[in-house]
Design a protein with these regions (language model features):
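Glycine-rich adenosine-cofactor-binding loop
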Residues: 19-44, 48-54, 193
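Conserved active-site and cofactor/substrate-binding residues in soluble primary-metabolism enzymes
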Residues: 26, 34, 70-73, 77, ...
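A structured beta-alpha segment of the ubiquitous adenosine-cofactor-binding alpha/beta core
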Residues: 73-104, 111-114
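N-terminal charged helix/coil linker that caps or initiates catalytic domains
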Residues: 1-23, 158
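Conserved beta-strand segments of alpha/beta enzyme cores
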Residues: 46, 89-91, 133
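Glycine-rich phosphate/adenylate-binding loop
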Residues: 22, 102-106, 110-237
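Glycine-rich phosphate-binding loop and adjoining beta1-alpha1-beta2 segment
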Residues: 46-86
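Short His-Asn-centered micro-motif
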Residues: 26-29, 50, 94-95, 109-112, ...
């Protein structure tokens, strides 16, 4: 049963229109933990979360966890946080995703390394008809990227794969950065969840606020100074 009152946003995003579609969130770190909580606050119930880490002291400043969660598996702590905030239950898996798992309609790919993302993509997402949308985020100190891909569309597959890089690059520029700033993660996570909102409204044609939209596949932002750039892979030659 949906225990959260969604009347304040239902004209922009209706959980009933989303229905029983399954969402898989792979990684419950700086962006993943926030994304899971935001999805639940939208009223979505079929949320599945994968992570194999425990909450450590350095996670408190940039993730949704509290001091009381230190030492607990992230997925267990996140389950309790979501329940306390929304009354909703999420499904959790305290395990590493290796590509053997069957994933659902929407996948948020948010693991710590680019190599693990590529492995999961190749084995469990790429050209899998069960998954209609993949959203991936990358974060630096004051900048980030959001990728929004239909993994069965060849132009989008090619466009996303051309953005990939090795872990040694990621360590200094994006998701592997040793510096992680909470407000950057907040901005990135909200931007990622908004792409799900946009996707559903485009898919259903039921955006009751009357806004016409076309999905972007790459969104780049910088916060110093505030700048945002977008690109659509379907328009690539």
């Amino acid at each position: 049963m949906n225990n959260i009152d969604t009347t304040r946003h239902v004209d922009v995003f209706s959980p009933d229109a989303f229905g029983k579609r399954r969402i898989d969130v792979i990684g419950a770190g700086a962006s993943g933990s926030r994304i899971v909580l935001a999805l639940a606050k939208l009223g979505l119930e079929n949320i599945h979360v994968f992570d194999f880490d425990i909450v450590e002291a350095h996670n408190i400043a940039n993730q949704v966890f509290s001091q009381a969660d230190i030492g607990r598996p992230k997925v267990e702590a996140l389950r309790d946080i979501v329940k306390a905030h929304t009354g909703l239950e999420i499904t959790i898996y305290n395990e590493r995703v290796d590509g053997s798992q069957k994933l659902g309609d929407v996948v948020f790919l948010l693991t710590d390394t680019m190599s693990s993302r590529q492995e999961i993509w190749k084995k469990a997402i790429r050209y899998k008809v069960a998954t209609k949308l993949m959203i991936e985020t990358r974060m630096g100190v004051d900048q980030g990227r959001v990728y929004v891909v239909n993994p069965t569309r060849s132009a989008q597959v090619r466009g996303w794969e051309e953005t990939l890089y090795d872990d040694d690059v990621a360590e200094v520029s994006a998701c592997g950065s040793t510096i992680s700033v909470g407000p950057t993660a907040e901005y990135l996570s909200g931007l990622a969840v908004w792409q799900l909102i946009r996707w559903l409204n485009i898919e259903t044609g039921k955006s009751s606020d009357g806004v016409s939209d076309t999905l972007d596949h790459e969104i780049l932002f910088c916060l110093r100074p505030p700048t945002i750039l977008t690109r659509q892979f379907d328009q690539l030659i």
